[in-house]
């Protein structure tokens, strides 16, 4: 029997250079791929919230175009990460830039216009953190991609194939069918970032601890209803790893395409919105739990010692000001009987003395 892999081991696989990449999938499973630059009526521009025009350029970490999947025209949005240390800078270290998300948004519109099923492949550390992407409104573009996928009037399939990092991954994952390769991760933050925030240091131990907290594996995602199914994937050292994984991907995409083709788009939209609404929802407690909780609360209130300090002073205030007689007072705005401001206050707390 194979030993169950830890989250740390799965994360190592998800970030490995020899993990399957989007370009390999497109070359093996699709035919007649045409990049967005070759589409005659594809407009790489967007209107910003302030009314200005955003001109978009090629993002090396994003593959966008149209192709055929088993004879059917589809639109493709795929994130590409480096396959070697030498490719790291060429692919922006696996970080998708604002231009990539802008082009993805344009491709979503294109797919809806021509009734193309949208296939997205997610593999990114996260959104690009540099100033150039911020200047092109990357956070707004990521949010727009998420909203657009939820309202898209064409069928969509999303597959996480490596790293699903932060909002940059969510932007392409809100599809009618959502899958994940077994040796992939999906999380709100990279474990290194989580470790730096929670533990103030990034080591093997803190990364492993962060992964246990984040619970980013495919099994966790199925458990929480964030994906629909896991696509089987052999160990990376398997000599037939690539061929076996491609076969599994092809089978799942074929099955999903057949399912979606027979469903009405309105029903798919409602189903997707219901799935998203259920994410993170905790089951209602059983009646026996409620009764036990009420009993324990009454018992605790009966047995707890009397509070000798002012009950209106929060614990945090006592911690800051101590238990002296100098009760902290808030410097609030003072108004007269008619509601006119007599004295402006900052709201900060000061000792009464």
Language model: regions and residue ranges:
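Short low-complexity stretches enriched in small and charged residues
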Residues: 15-25, 75-78, 115, 132-137, ...
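Short charge-dense sequence patches
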Residues: 41, 49-62, 90-99, 169-174, ...
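Intrinsically disordered, low-complexity segments enriched in small/flexible residues
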Residues: 1-74, 78-83, 93, 239, ...
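Conserved catalytic cores of soluble enzyme domains
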Residues: 122-263
């Amino acid at each position: 029997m194979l030993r169950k892999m830890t989250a740390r081991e799965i994360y190592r696989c998800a970030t490995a250079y020899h993990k399957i990449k989007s370009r390999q999938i497109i070359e093996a499973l699709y035919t007649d791929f045409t990049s967005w630059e070759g589409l005659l009526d594809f407009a790489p521009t967007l209107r910003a919230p302030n009314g200005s025009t955003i001109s978009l350029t090629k993002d090396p970490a994003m593959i966008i175009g149209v192709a055929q999947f088993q004879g059917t025209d589809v639109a493709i949005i795929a994130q590409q990460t480096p396959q070697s240390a030498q490719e790291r800078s060429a692919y922006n270290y696996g970080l998708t830039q604002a231009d990539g998300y802008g082009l993805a948004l344009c491709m979503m519109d294109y797919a809806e216009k021509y009734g193309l099923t949208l296939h997205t492949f997610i593999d990114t550390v996260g959104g690009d953190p540099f100033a150039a992407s911020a200047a092109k409104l990357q956070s707004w573009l990521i949010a727009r991609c998420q909203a657009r996928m939820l309202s898209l009037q064409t069928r969509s399939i999303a597959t996480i194939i490596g790293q699903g990092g932060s909002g940059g991954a969510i932007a392409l994952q809100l599809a009618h069918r959502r899958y994940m390769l077994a040796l992939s991760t999906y999380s709100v933050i990279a474990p290194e970032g989580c470790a730096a925030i929670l533990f103030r240091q990034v080591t093997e131990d803190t990364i492993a601890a962060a992964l246990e907290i984040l619970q980013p594996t495919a099994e966790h995602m199925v458990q929480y209803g964030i994906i629909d199914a896991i696509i089987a994937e052999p160990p990376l050292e398997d000599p037939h790893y690539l061929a076996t994984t491609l076969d599994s991907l092809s089978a799942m995409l074929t099955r999903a395409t057949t399912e979606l083709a027979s469903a009405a788009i309105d029903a798919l939209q409602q189903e997707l919105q219901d799935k998203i609404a259920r994410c993170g929802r905790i089951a209602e407690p059983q009646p026996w739990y409620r009764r036990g909780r009420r009993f324990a609360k009454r018992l605790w209130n009966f047995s707890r010692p009397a509070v000798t300090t002012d009950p209106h002073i929060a614990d945090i205030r006592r911690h800051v000001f101590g238990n002296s007689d100098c009760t902290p007072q808030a410097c609030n705005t003072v108004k007269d009987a008619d509601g006119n401001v007599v004295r402006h206050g900052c709201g900060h707390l000061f000792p009464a003395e």
